[in-house]
């Protein structure tokens, strides 16, 4: 039975494996990147777990072209990033130890960005 399960999961792994289409190297200061969002022809990311309150904008070569500092808030544990036509949303709701009660989603006006 174990052999059948092993063969089954090996087959699924091969069947659903993905090929890397595009790969780039980010600077070392983005070693805790936790989110990615397409924005204005570039990509936005952020650092996790108490990093600086900065959204990093980089191109498809991995070159950081802008650092958008968010001065009004602290990065407790930023985890997620999304955008629409008017706002960028940052999910500050990392809570690995279940000890935070200040979980929030930041709403940043693109006009102020």
Model region roles, listed by residue range:
Residues 32, 75-77:
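Beta-rich catalytic cores
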């Amino acid at each position: 039975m174990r052999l059948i399960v092993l063969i089954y999961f090996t087959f699924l792994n091969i069947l659903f494996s993905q090929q890397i289409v595009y790969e780039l190297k980010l600077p070392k200061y983005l070693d805790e990147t936790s989110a990615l969002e397409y924005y204005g022809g570039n990509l936005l990311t952020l650092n996790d777990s108490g990093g600086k309150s900065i959204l990093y904008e980089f191109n498809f070569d991995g070159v950081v072209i802008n650092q958008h500092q968010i001065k009004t808030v602290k990065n407790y544990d930023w985890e997620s990033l999304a955008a629409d036509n008017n706002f960028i949303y940052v999910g500050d709701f990392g809570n690995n130890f279940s000890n935070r009660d200040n979980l929030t989603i930041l709403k940043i006006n693109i006009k102020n960005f």
